[in-house]
Swiss-Prot record:
This protein's name: Protein Early 65 kDa
Keywords (A to Z) from UniProt: Early protein, Host cytoplasm
Organism: Autographa californica nuclear polyhedrosis virus (AcMNPV)
GO cellular component: host cell cytoplasm
Protein role: May participate in the recruitment of G-actin to the host nucleus.
Cellular compartment(s): Host cytoplasm
Length: 553
């Protein structure tokens, strides 16, 4: 989860007065399911306006909307007013990868952003002109230096300094630097020596004087509008020489993939780096998906309520990352407590894969050795260790995963803790579903992870209608692999027609359920005999001909 709170109002822009409130934008990231629904219902991620307890204006924005706003230049506040320390995850830990992505995204979109800043009308009041002054100063800064300013405050931009230099206007309507030095605006050369280490320069003293006048919020003067009209024309003339940037559909694609939790926030030029590979988002099992699992063997693991954590081996270096964020330097959840053991296991795996692979797993336990603050909602009182890592997948450079069963064996052999796996027929699993943990009997069970071939789903304990996941029993429900093999000599896929003939005769099939029987038998032996789509087509063709032949009726 992402939580970013930034000030986008007069305080951030440097023209606030004592009575000014604060204008906040709060960005959060919706879950995958909400974003999927947003594709058909744009109202789901619509901005929401409110007031906080202090009466400040608050706009709630989904992160996807904020990122697209930067890309298009139409609502770039997230990139313009945020600082590195503003980017946090739900644990309050710095999200450096997202900050770097937003910074790069802003660089790509700067021309579109400054065109947006130029579109506002010239208003006939001091406050409106100060708002416009911010826009024009920002645009002029970019045209002069070809980069974003170090600060978003008007005076700091004019003097080309960052927020470490404090420039304010006192009660006597004088500009003061660092609360000590008063600037003499009648000194027209634009240079102001503050001390032996700091001299400030400004190219337009007249603009400084206009700022002071506007900050007094006095009676409107026509000459102000005339100044802004002339200034606007000068900027537009300069912008005529700045070409429109090309559309970046590749970046838009990556933003969408990030919203779907299929990728972290990464620019296209970086997406093939192994440190930015993340574990694919897992969909919820629901009624609409049960048909793909009916009559098939599934592998089930308990879903642990920890923190998704990846260990990356790349160029003989081991680094770490959370769900969507690469964390080469951050001490996520104080994982240093088990870091030595993790790296020992990774080095053992490196002997098998050489270099360029990722181990995905779950950090479980507490943020501290005293066990005072659980990592997540569920408190696993059965766990003796203050922090433990359960590994569950291995991904190679390029995105390919090691087959799941093979990966479990490899992870266990090198010393990783793994989550026990159990095999069931899907129909039996949902019929006897029980949300009780075998790993942690004294703690609630968050749910299950269910795998079938390349399919993977999660089933949480709060699923509303479990009965809808069950498979209605058909006329051939009693057929099992064990029954067939004990009554029919079957060794491999070459015996499939023999099996089909046996089942056809045993079940006394009618015309309307011939295909139902075929699908039932095919799925029973699909994994065991390694049957594929071509096998299905060839066998079904023979089966249809067999059904037409009276000698089998």
């Amino acid at each position: 989860m992402v939580y970013i709170c930034i000030d986008t109002g007069s305080h951030a822009k440097g023209y606030a007065v004592e009575s000014s409130d604060t204008d906040y934008h709060i960005y959060t990231k919706c879950d995958r399911e909400t974003f999927e629904k947003f594709i058909d219902n744009k109202e789901l991620l619509k901005n929401r306006h409110a007031k906080d307890e202090s009466g400040n204006d608050v706009k709630y924005v989904d992160l996807y909307t904020g990122l697209i706003g930067i890309l298009t230049g139409k609502s770039p506040e997230l990139s313009m007013f945020s600082k590195r320390e503003d980017f946090k995850d739900k644990y309050g830990i710095e999200n450096l990868q997202l900050y770097e992505f937003v910074t790069k995204l802003m660089t790509v979109s700067m021309v579109k952003i400054i065109y947006t800043l130029m579109r506002y009308k010239i208003l006939n009041n001091a406050k409106g002109l100060l708002q416009l002054m911010f826009n024009y100063v920002y645009v002029e800064y970019y045209l002069d230096y070809k980069r974003a300013p170090k600060s978003t405050k008007i005076l700091n931009m004019l003097f080309n300094v960052g927020d470490e230099i404090k420039i304010t206007m006192d009660k006597n309507n004088q500009l003061v630097v660092n609360d000590l030095n008063v600037l003499d605006l009648n000194k027209n050369n634009g240079g102001y020596k503050i001390d032996e280490t700091l001299t400030l320069f400004v190219k337009n003293v007249k603009l400084l004087k206009l700022y002071v006048k506007l900050m007094q919020r006095g009676e409107y003067q026509q000459e102000w509008t005339e100044y802004f009209q002339q200034w606007k024309q000068q900027l537009q003339d300069r912008l005529h020489h700045v070409p429109e940037p090309p559309e970046r559909t590749d970046i838009r694609h990556n933003i969408v993939m990030y919203a779907l939790n299929e990728r972290g926030p990464v620019m296209p030029e970086d997406e093939n780096k192994i440190v930015y590979q993340i574990y694919p988002s897992v969909s919820h099992l629901d009624q609409g998906k049960k048909g793909t699992l009916a009559d098939k063997e599934i592998i089930v693991q308990e879903k642990l309520d920890g923190c998704n954590f990846r260990i990356i081996c790349n160029q003989n270096k081991i680094t770490y990352g959370s769900r969507n964020t690469y964390r080469p330097d951050g001490n996520f959840m104080n994982y240093y407590r088990i870091r030595k053991d993790l790296e020992t296991c990774m080095r053992s795996l490196q002997a098998r894969f050489n270099d360029g692979f990722i181990v995905y797993g779950e950090l479980m336990g507490w943020k501290d050795d005293a066990k005072t603050t659980p990592i997540n909602v569920i408190n696993y009182v059965d766990q003796k260790e203050s922090l433990k890592y359960y590994a569950y997948e291995i991904q190679l450079y390029g995105g390919e995963f090691v087959p799941f069963v093979e990966a479990q064996e490899l992870l266990t052999n090198v010393g990783f803790n793994t989550i026990p796996c159990h095999k069931y027929l899907y129909n039996d699993f949902v019929e006897r579903l029980n949300f009780k943990s075998l790993m942690f009997p004294q703690s609630p069970l968050e749910g299950f992870i269910i795998r079938c071939g390349n399919l993977i789903y999660k089933l949480k304990s709060d699923y509303k209608d479990l009965n809808k996941l069950k498979i209605e029993k058909g006329p051939f429900e009693w057929l099992t692999c064990d029954y067939i093999k004990s009554n029919c000599d079957a060794i491999d896929k070459s015996d499939m027609m023999k099996i089909l003939i046996f089942c056809y005769n045993m079940c006394k099939v009618k015309n309307y359920n011939e295909k139902l029987l075929f699908n039932k038998v095919f799925n029973l032996f699909r994994q065991q005999f390694n049957l594929n789509h071509n096998d299905y087509k060839n066998l079904y063709k023979q089966y249809v001909n067999m059904c037409k032949c009276t000698e089998y009726k």
